[in-house]
Design a protein with these regions (language model features):
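Extracellular Cys-Trp
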Residues: 1-101
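Structured, hydrophobic secondary-structure cores that serve as assembly/anchoring elements
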Residues: 82-254
Length: 254
């Protein structure tokens, strides 16, 4: 099957433009299993699926109006856009430059409700002052389907930029470990301090490109030995950065 063939490979985004609920459910379960059990950190982009409530799944509400086209054809564009998006960037407000005609016929309250429900939305943005009366089709906000916010997983986890940072951190740490330490460096204090120093360098680079903020060395403790002699345990904190989306102004009349 497709899933069996793709599972061994590294990729950032998986997309399915169809509306078959059986296939959608299969891919959602595959995404959850890979993210939580095998360490494969990718997101799934699908069309029209509601109440998914999972940071690893992005569901587009808008359909396309082109004759003969799959209603969920925006999945193709968004799959590429999300895959190409850097960890210090967001797809929010990105102009849709694809070949399909997007249905953006949503009222403001409908847009707000859709976002509240975890649906990825495109909307029309015009600027009559500049002469752009027709407007552009843009991404409203770069979110995933996660909606049931808790103390352990706050609203930050609804943002795809945050998920990108966390996923890439997991991938980069794993690659660092596999490339330099796996089967090569002893699991003693000196070996774990060496791993810690490389981790510090990695997250200093994350902070340099503004993917994370407020990082200090103390956020990354030295790894410890696990229950087995070959096991290394590492718990640390990072604070992903997010792009500006909302502006609140107070005008004081002098």
């Amino acid at each position: 099957s497709f899933i069996e063939h793709i599972e061994p490979y590294y990729f950032n985004i998986l997309g399915y433009a169809g509306s078959d609920e059986t296939v959608q459910s299969l891919l959602i379960n595959f995404t959850k299993r890979c993210r939580e059990n095998t360490g494969s950190k990718f997101q799934l982009v699908i069309y029209g699926k509601t109440k998914v409530n999972y940071p690893g799944v992005i569901s587009i509400k808008n359909n396309v109006t082109d004759t003969g086209a799959e209603k969920g054809s925006l999945v193709y564009w968004l799959t590429g856009k999300e895959a190409a998006c850097a960890i210090n960037a967001s797809c929010t407000n990105a102009i849709y430059d694809g070949e399909y005609t997007v249905n953006t016929n949503f009222k403001q309250y409908e847009l707000e409700q859709a976002v509240s429900d975890g649906m990825f939305m495109f909307h029309n943005v015009s600027d009559s002052v500049s002469g752009n009366v027709l407007g552009d089709t843009r991404v409203l906000t770069d979110i995933n389907t996660f909606t049931e916010v808790t103390k352990a997983m706050n609203k930050d986890f609804t943002l795809n930029q945050v998920i990108r940072v966390l996923d890439n951190a997991a991938i980069d740490i794993a690659r660092l470990f596999n490339r330099i330490y796996l089967g090569k460096v002893q699991n003693d204090a000196d070996g774990r301090i060496s791993l810690w120093k490389d981790g510090i360098a990695l997250f200093e680079e994350y902070q340099r490109v503004r993917a994370i903020q407020n990082f200090v060395d103390d956020d990354l403790p030295v790894p410890t030995q696990g229950e087995e002699k070959t096991a290394v345990l590492w718990t640390f904190e990072i604070q992903p950065t997010a792009c500006m989306e909302k502006l609140y102004c107070t005008v004081v009349v002098a």
